[in-house]
Amino acid sequence: MTPVVSIIMGSTSDLPVMEKAAKLLDEMEIPFEMHALSAHRTPAEVEAFAKGAKDRGIKVIIAAAGMAAHLCGVIASMTTVPVIGVPINSTLDGMDALLAIVQMPPGIPVATVGINGALNAGILAVQMLAVGDEQLQGKLADYKENLKKKIVKANEEFAQVSFKYKTN
């Protein structure tokens, strides 16, 4: 099985956040790979990964980074494969990572999700891959329909909650 998505993170400490993207890709039956790379500690490996991703069949890269968060932008600067950045909450409540990822110079875009937003990164990757793939579009439609059903169920449960001044 050849991976079409790469999930990249700075270290194993990012895995509890990034496994949300991995679980979604697994659920959608999309082959993916996971690597630990660091823009600061392993720059040569980051360069080799980024420059070789397209030739290896990678169609979307999900990159997570905290603090200075250069990983996403460095990867994006060396490939034409779309990069989705996931800012990791560490110092400054993740705002430093968010701003570092979202404020890319013209010509080097990184699609950025919210702080610790790995699930949305996974969904966005699936949406990118689903362009022109009706089967994958169907899986996405089912996924989103299930989200809707959860809200409908929540409202049914709220209807059973009783308070003296609750009007519905």
PLM regions: where:
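Glycine-rich phosphate/diphosphate-binding loop of Rossmann-like nucleotide-binding domains
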Residues: T2-R41
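Glycine/charged-rich beta-loop-alpha catalytic/anionic-binding loops adjacent to active sites
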Residues: P3, I30-P31, T80-V81, V102-V110
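Short glycine/serine/threonine-rich phosphate/pyrophosphate-binding segments
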Residues: D14-M18, T42-V46, A65-V74, D93-M95, ...
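N-terminal beta-loop-helix "entrance" segment that forms/cooperates
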Residues: M34-R56
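Glycine-rich phosphate-binding loop
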Residues: F49-P87
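Short, glycine-/small-residue-rich phosphate/pyrophosphate-handling segment
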Residues: L92-G138
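Glycine-rich phosphate/pyrophosphate-binding loop and the adjoining helix
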Residues: L129-N168
